[in-house]
Curated annotation (Swiss-Prot):
HAMAP family: UPF0301
Family: Belongs to the UPF0301 (AlgH) family.
NCBIfam families named among the record's database cross-references: PRK00228.1-1 (NF001266)
Cleavable signal peptide: none
Upper lineage: Bacteria, Pseudomonadati, Pseudomonadota, Betaproteobacteria, Nitrosomonadales
Domain of life: Bacteria
Cited SUPFAM superfamilies: VC0467-like
Any Pfam family: DUF179
Organism of this sequence: Thiobacillus denitrificans (strain ATCC 25259 / T1)
Gene Ontology cellular component terms for the protein in this record: cytosol
Protein name per its UniProtKB record: UPF0301 protein Tbd_2579
Amino acid sequence: MENVNLTNHFLIAMPGMVDPNFNGTLTYICDHSDQGALGVVVNRPIDLDLSTLFEQIGLSLPEGLHGEIVYFGGPVQTERGFVLHTPPLTFSSTLTVNDAVSLTTSKDVLEAVSQGAGPEKFIVSLGYAGWSAGQLEDELKQNAWLSVAADPQVIFDLAPEERLPAAMKLLGIDFASLSDEAGHA
């Protein structure tokens, strides 16, 4: 498991996940190396909408985006925005994950959205999920997560409550059939 790279994969929290930050979550891994991993939870809306967030940071929001929600991205730096979006636009702090997904943490992406010049598809999260070197690999060995190659349509085209079941379907598994008991062959 040491040589596995989970960049551009989903992590599906197993039913027995005891950490309330991740119970029932689908996390998109933006970067994974021997230094650790960085991901964003993509299926946990918080009690904040995009129009309120934009108002708080002094930006106007185009009319068609007023109902959009903000997500809990993870328990690290929860006061900071993390925007998953489609390329090709890049901003001052954009990490291009692949040709379908980028991650930006600088305010200029939100300024572009405010001006109607932002990415075609995006979700805004507060916070991120981070793992130190070897930590994610250890959690995988302990059966805390399932992993599957990510499909950007799950992130950008489905409602939050549809994302976890859709990721499970990529594995060919019905989430309801999973046990919270760990086992090893």
